[in-house]
Amino acid sequence: SVLLGGIHFASTWLGKVQEAFSAGTLGYLFLLLALFGILIALLDSSGAVTEFAAWLSRYANSRKKTLFITYILGLSIFVDDYLNNMAISTAMKKVSDSHKIPRTMLGYVVNGTGATDCVIIPISTWAVFYAGLFKQFGVTVNGSGTQAYFAAIPYMFYPWITLIVLILVILGVIPKMGVIKKHDKIAMETGVVCTTDVSLDGVEIQAPDFESIIGENSKARPWNFLVPLVVLVGVTILADINVMAGCMAGIAVTAVLMLAQRKIKLAEIFDNAYQGVLSMVMICAIITMALTLVQINTATGMPDFVVSILKPILHGALLPAIVFAFCAVYSFFGGGFWDMAMIFMPIVVPLANALGVDPLLPCAALVCASVAGSNTYVCGDAVMITSRALDIKPYYQMMGTLPYAVISYLLSIVCFVVVGFLNL
């Protein structure tokens, strides 16, 4: 803002905030997050989450099984990364706590299966967005952006590698590193899965004794949690990947189920709705600042500056690798994943055509860069949503993921270099 407006930086900054609001993304995110907050509050206060956790703990009876079940659930909810991160975090955190799995480790597994499977399973909000973007910039197969997107999926190396790395971490083939290693040691020695420094609310989270919960809830059933979740996913798909419609349907079904079983009173539904919306205020404020930063980066010419650096070293075979490497870093520091793709797509496609490179490759690299940013950007919506659901600070969520994301990042660059030379 200072670079753009000088001494009038305050009014410049406010103008960029207004631009962020007028873009439409914020309004959508605010309403969607409010609906998620209501749904989570209803499921939590009615005991549906606790019952599901108690039921699931019979099968998730070890640390590895718990993380593997989290991984499978993450793959099964592929229609939207917001839905994935929020639902899986809410469902698994109590079971995870009972096995002294640090919240940062759970967050890594949850967020690692968020946008990653959304891009490689083409029935998702991400696939719909990028297929439209491909067509808009002339990247088609048989005149179809959707078919072009399908054709690009095998070249989306970052999400494929990330899912493999996740499995290897869960199995212990790849060791715990950095923040996760530190927090795992604390959890195993003290039973504290989230310290006051890490907790979003500054409250120490202790691992519960799930044996007693199962004993008290021997008839615990998963349906009060699973039925709203299935309705949410089903309506989302039937409504042309409209997560908002799915979320509203999930809220309605949850309310009916809980009222019918007398688990909650009508007045409590409205109280929980208010508390659910209130719980999302902080994340909405942070996302507003993040999208404002995207507007400022665009206005200051950051994308053009990046391109000016890339031009002297561009080579046709290296284009996909360079696009991924630089755009992933841009997403990590500058924020904006879909926004980043919209900024760089009109630059990347003409460059690919001019250098004689199949535009599917750099376009796949752009998708990968978006996913890398989504997994790691500290103020990004994916990290923020997961952090809120798991009650941990976004910084620790990012730092827990970062070492493994770097592994996927470096291996993806190697894959893009190899494929770039093979397809030139």
Cite the ranges covered by each PLM segment.
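Hydrophobic alpha-helical membrane segments of integral membrane proteins
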Residues: 1, 84-89, 160-161, 245-250, ...
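Juxtamembrane inter-helical linkers in multi-pass membrane proteins
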Residues: 58, 62, 90-107, 182-210
